[in-house]
């Protein structure tokens, strides 16, 4: 019986395979206990176009803790602004097997509110 990490990675592989068939820009996220990371990856999957995370110096000054829903919303807003700067409006959301809840949902909602279409 697979443990929770193996199950998450299996879900992530399935999602990435479906997104790869579409050849669209992918908004990939990663969540750790302390931080959240977001990357815009091109359709071929070989190039990171933009990224944002709670490790960026500007955000570290602004946020006392990088592992909160508020921090995730700020990262979502920031990655959406960077995407608009590159002329990207539509992305496929790759939640990396994480449940669409809490910080993952906050990041996605903030990105949508700031102009990204999923």
Swiss-Prot record:
GO biological process: translation
CDD domains hit by this protein: Ribosomal_L18_L5e
Function field: This is one of the proteins that bind and probably mediate the attachment of the 5S RNA into the large ribosomal subunit, where it forms part of the central protuberance.
HAMAP family recorded: Ribosomal_uL18_B
Entry similarity comment: Belongs to the universal ribosomal protein uL18 family.
Oligomer and partners: Part of the 50S ribosomal subunit; part of the 5S rRNA/L5/L18/L25 subcomplex. Contacts the 5S and 23S rRNAs.
Protein name: Large ribosomal subunit protein uL18
Natural source organism: Nitrosospira multiformis (strain ATCC 25196 / NCIMB 11849 / C 71)
Gene: rplR
